[in-house]
């Protein structure tokens, strides 16, 4: 029989999993997500992507500020769920919540654990130059992404991929993986494996202060830094435009031939020298403007060879 599930998630990454579980006949007893936040020009309250998806499913939506009260625990238990599925919820579950569903709580995590436990695994895998990443379903325990692993899928990370590309691919893969995991749980055949104690790394939350591009680094590291932060918060540099430094977010680039002083524009196509090698910018964004190709940008704002990027 299909499982009765509580789903807990917040961003767009979690939506495919919620929809897939519902499409496969599981009973979504309740959807927990974060509270609406003001956004946009009018700063109107906007519900999370998961809340909007839950409304389409006509599933009850709950946005508790905390799960650490007796009332929150009683409300959670009242759903009488067989299991909970957690995907980027954004709130730590206390042990009492983890213990509430008869079959446990299962998390979809966007890395190949134990590498990149924590808040920003997709970004950190790209920025570190990893050749691959993936998604894993684990049975949650009280630790930070330390639970026993049930299933995993891997993907290659190419130099052309931004965090958006990785995000979208893993969100789709993860939805299928969780459906398979819940089917195995339903049959009583979900196999769990303890995580290795070797190779543990932590994916710290992205800080806007680390977004500035350091062209003294090798070209591959500059590229991965840019792609690991695209589109948000966006890796940035300053270009001299009409005698003034203007902050530009670089959204996409490629490794290019050529050498020069780090930060030097070495041709007419916005190729910028790095500590070793060079990158060619292919997509960028000025403050308050829509993203554009480098070609579109250069038509309106020529950048001469020899200019230094800050």
Curated annotation (Swiss-Prot):
The gene is fmt. Keywords: Protein biosynthesis, Transferase. Attaches a formyl group to the free amino group of methionyl-tRNA(fMet). The formyl group appears to play a dual role in the initiator identity of N-formylmethionyl-tRNA by promoting its recognition by IF2 and preventing the misappropriation of this tRNA by the elongation apparatus. PROSITE patterns: GART (PS00373). It is an enzyme of class 2 (transferase). Coiled coil: none annotated. This is Methionyl-tRNA formyltransferase. (6S)-5,6,7,8-tetrahydrofolate binds at residues 111-114. InterPro entries: Fmt, Formyl_trans_C, Formyl_transf_N, Formyl_transf_N_sf, Formyl_transferase-like_C_sf, GART_AS, Met-tRNA-FMT_C, Met-tRNA-FMT_N. HAMAP family: Formyl_trans. One of its GO terms (cellular component) is cytosol. One of its GO terms (molecular function) is methionyl-tRNA formyltransferase activity. Its EC number is 2.1.2.9. Belongs to the Fmt family. It catalyses: L-methionyl-tRNA(fMet) + (6R)-10-formyltetrahydrofolate = N-formyl-L-methionyl-tRNA(fMet) + (6S)-5,6,7,8-tetrahydrofolate + H(+).
């Amino acid at each position: 029989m299909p499982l009765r599930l509580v789903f807990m998630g917040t961003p767009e990454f979690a939506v495919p999993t919620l929809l897939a579980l519902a499409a496969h006949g599981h009973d979504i007893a309740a959807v927990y997500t974060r509270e609406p936040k003001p956004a946009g020009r009018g700063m109107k309250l906007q519900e999370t992507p998961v809340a909007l998806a839950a409304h389409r499913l006509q599933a009850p939506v709950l946005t508790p500020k905390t799960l650490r009260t007796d009332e929150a625990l009683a409300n959670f238990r009242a759903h009488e769920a067989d299991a909970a599925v957690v995907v980027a919820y954004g709130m730590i579950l206390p042990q009492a919540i983890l213990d509430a569903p008869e079959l446990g709580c299962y998390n979809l995590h966007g890395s190949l654990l134990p590498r990149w436990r924590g808040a920003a695994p997709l970004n950190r895998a790209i920025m570190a130059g990893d050749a691959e990443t993936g998604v894993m379903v684990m049975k949650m325990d009280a630790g930070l992404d330390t639970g026993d692993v049930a299933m995993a899928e891997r993907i290659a990370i190419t130099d052309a991929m931004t965090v958006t590309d990785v995000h979208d691919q893993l969100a789709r893969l993860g939805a299928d993986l969780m459906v398979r995991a819940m089917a195995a749980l339903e049959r009583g055949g979900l196999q769990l494996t303890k995580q290795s104690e070797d190779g543990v790394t932590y994916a710290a939350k992205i800080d806007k202060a680390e977004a500035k591009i350091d062209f003294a680094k090798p070209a591959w590291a500059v590229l991965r830094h840019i792609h690991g932060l695209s589109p948000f918060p966006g890796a940035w540099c300053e270009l001299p435009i009409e005698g003034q430094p203007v902050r530009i977010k670089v959204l996409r680039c490629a490794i290019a031939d050529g050498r020069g002083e780090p930060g030097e524009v070495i041709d007419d196509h916005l190729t910028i020298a790095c500590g070793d090698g060079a990158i060619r910018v292919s997509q960028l964004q000025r403050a308050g403007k829509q993203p554009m190709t480098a070609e579109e940008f250069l038509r309106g704002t020529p950048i001469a060879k020899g200019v230094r990027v800050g």
